[in-house]
Swiss-Prot record:
The gene is uvrB. The keyword ATP-binding applies. The beta-hairpin motif is involved in DNA binding. Its main location: cytoplasm. This is UvrABC system protein B. It is found in: Cytoplasm. NCBIfam families: PRK05298.1, uvrb. It comes from Lactiplantibacillus plantarum (strain ATCC BAA-793 / NCIMB 8826 / WCFS1). A motif (Beta-hairpin) lies at residues 97-120.
Length: 667
């Protein structure tokens, strides 16, 4: 057990003071929280500094805070911003640690069973451990999370009970410490020293915490007493600091013990017996045989190894939960009086609601056809009503709050004025005929003045074709799509801001929270095609991407003006009028937001070759003379042709794209 520090305070560090309507928003939200208001809405137009406002609120109310975001890109962006605002506090990041995840599934129509397949990102796993350990150690914690936070995580009480606490002068046998480390899933490896491992040299035990990747701990014994504890650089072994006390958290969030495991196995075997009788009585002999074979194998693995592939399907027994009871999640690691902030709530809350149903439908097939026991259905995300039961106090943040939030509270705080005096962008509607040539002209105007462009399309095919077309014209362009891995999207947004390319094409990824002040033009293709991506809320969000630049403008390419288009244009005009009046009254001249480009979370290099091309562009090409650059392009073209001759078309295509980018870079 560890002693949690509850007297820390949030220390907001910023060169700016709240301006515009930020002060009244901060005051109203803070007063609402302090008076016990359970749910509030911050209706903040794009670029009005909602993150800064909520940071001020967090600092004033001093509660552990969960920031819930609807995707990893935005979560990564928010993580960087909050880390900058609170450098002296624990700002953590908690998203799914899978680079790739194929869930277990069964398709009856084709009798196809799909095994679970996944690739875990070690960096994100480290950050997840850092988040949970911080929540148990201190109160000044902000966790920026995706909806991964409502998925099963393991019992926080078991996790905390297994923490190994070490102090200088403490009497403990060295071998007892080693056994404790093994119990909390640490591996001994005296050669390959990594997270979640320890190594032993005589009376010295070095432990690499699961929540760190830079510093390890060196515990020095004198007999059966801890003589000294030192924090060391894991790579060089240099001493960083002396420590009087350390808490070693488990290397996994799913902790158990022999008694729990024994009880769980009994429960699994009892359920298997009952389920086999049901299936046999229903004449489902194949399903019964399949279930018996698979479950018996899992039970044998649990008995012998304490682990089996797919152990999460038995989590109900491991946690000691009753049928239907919700699983433990990140929310259970927070104290009861925590503050929840839902970013882009109009998207996040429907996503939270949909998680349970999608998971249930897939697992029900596995249960019905004898691949899993019915208890596997309890390895699931939380239902919306279960999330609501965890909520102590919540602030929903959005420029366009959804019906869920608006139905739950009338306490709406508006924030329309931007601190920089920036106005909502101007909007033009232009005909679809000749739209691409028109768009090329507009792009070139922006490139000449070092500004960026967002283009949003309706289909992946159109986005890809448009990207290829622009590349052929020598325009530096990238395509942001759903196949891009976890945090590589954040890298792309950062590269756009750095000017490594000028145009970003996307489908529905260029709406909420993508924060690029350098973007002065947003082009919306097929704006008159009513639907999810072109409704009023989506259009307002997309328009908002141009609201951080003093030259911000939006062009909608459409042959008719739909009701959604008109409503979005009317709301934008209303806000623009309010903003212009405020600027006139206070003699403010709008200026583009000057925002530092933050460093990336270290996990952006998620695969073996992720970012190789970008690394090449960054480290070598920019430093070459023009003659060297042309020579490099020539060599790459030769490699491209060689790859094509060998029928390695994937490599050839990668080299082709690189050559096109390099040619555009020097043109």
């Amino acid at each position: 057990m560890i002693d949690r520090v509850d007297n820390n305070h949030f220390d907001l560090v910023s060169d700016y003071q709240p301006t515009g309507d930020q002060p009244q928003a901060i005051q109203q939200l803070t007063a609402g929280i302090e008076s016990g208001e359970k749910e509030q809405i911050l209706l903040g137009a794009t670029g009005t500094g909602k993150t800064f406002t909520i940071s001020n609120v967090i600092a004033k109310v001093n509660k552990p805070t969960l920031i819930l975001s609807h995707n990893k890109t935005l979560a990564g962006q928010l993580y960087g911003e909050f880390k900058k605002f609170f450098p002296n506090n624990a700002v953590e990041y908690f998203v799914s640690y899978y680079d790739y995840y194929q869930p277990e599934a069964y398709v009856p129509s084709s009798d196809t069973y799909i095994e679970k397949d996944s690739a875990i990102n070690d960096e994100i796993d480290k950050l997840r451990h850092s988040a949970t350990s911080s929540l148990l150690e201190r109160n000044d914690v902000i966790v920026v999370a995706s909806v991964s936070s409502i998925f099963g995580l393991g019992d926080p009480h078991e996790y905390q009970d297994h923490v190994v606490s070490l102090r200088v002068g403490m009497e403990i046998d060295r071998n007892d410490l080693l056994r404790k480390l093994v119990d909390i899933q640490f591996d001994r490896n005296d050669i390959d020293f990594q997270r979640g491992r320890f190594r032993v040299h005589g009376d010295v035990v070095e432990i690499f915490p699961a929540s760190r990747d830079d510093h390890a701990l060196r515990v020095e014994f004198f007999g059966d007493e801890i003589d000294r504890i030192r924090e060391i650089d894991a790579l060089t072994g240099e001493i960083v600091a002396d420590r009087e006390h350390v808490a070693i958290f488990p290397a996994t969030h799913f902790m158990t013990n022999d008694a729990i495991m024994e009880h769980a196995i009994k429960g699994i075997e009892d359920e298997l017996d009952g389920r086999l009788k049901e299936l046999t009585a229903d004449g489902k002999l194949l399903e019964a045989q399949r279930l018996k074979q698979r479950t018996t194998y899992d039970v044998e693995m649990l008995k012998e190894m304490g682990y089996t592939s797919g152990i999460e399907n038995y989590s109900r027994f491991m946690d000691g939960r009753k049928p239907g009871e919700p699983p433990y999640t990140l929310l259970d690691f927070f104290p009861k009086d925590f503050l929840l902030v839902v970013d882009e709530s109009h998207v996040t809350m429907p996503q939270v609601r949909g998680m349970y149903n999608g998971d249930r439908a897939r697992k029900q097939m596995l249960v019905d056809y004898g691949f899993r026991l019915p208890s596997a259905l309890d390895n699931r995300p939380l239902k919306l009503e279960e999330v609501e039961q965890h909520i102590n106090q919540v602030v929903y943040m959005s420029a366009t709050p959804g019906p869920y939030e608006m139905d739950r509270t009338k306490h709406v705080v508006q924030q329309i004025i931007r601190p920089t005096g920036l106005l909502d962008p101007t909007i033009e509607v232009r005909p679809i005929m000749g739209q691409i040539d028109d768009l090329v002209g507009e792009i070139n105007k922006r490139i000449e003045v070092n500004e960026r462009v967002f283009i949003t399309t309706l289909t992946k095919k159109m986005a890809e074709d448009l990207t290829d077309y622009f590349k052929d014209l020598g325009i530096k362009v990238r395509y942001l799509h759903s196949d891009i891995k976890t945090l590589e999207r954040t890298q792309i947004i950062r590269d756009l801001r750095l000017g490594k390319f000028d145009v970003l094409v996307g489908i529905n990824l260029l709406r909420e929270g993508i924060d690029v002040p350098e973007v002065s033009l947003v082009a919306i293709l097929d704006a008159d095609k009513e639907g999810f991506l072109r409704n009023e809320r989506s259009l307002i969000q997309t328009i908002g991407r141009a609201a951080r630049n003093e030259h911000g403008s939006v062009i909608m390419y459409a042959d008719t003006t739909t009701d959604s288009m008109q409503a979005a244009m009317d709301e934008t005009a209303r806000r623009r009028a309010v903003q212009m009046k405020y600027n006139e009254d206070h003699h403010i001249t709008p200026h583009t937001i000057k925002k530092a480009i933050p460093e990336l979370i270290a996990s952006t290099k998620t695969t073996e070759d992720a970012g190789k091309k970008d690394d090449f562009l960054e480290t070598d090409f920019d430093d070459m003379t023009r003659e060297q650059q042309l020579d490099m392009i020539s060599k790459l073209e030769e490699q491209m042709k060689t790859a094509a001759k060998k029928l390695d078309f994937e490599q050839a295509a990668t080299l082709r794209d690189t050559v096109m980018e390099l040619k555009a870079q020097i043109s």
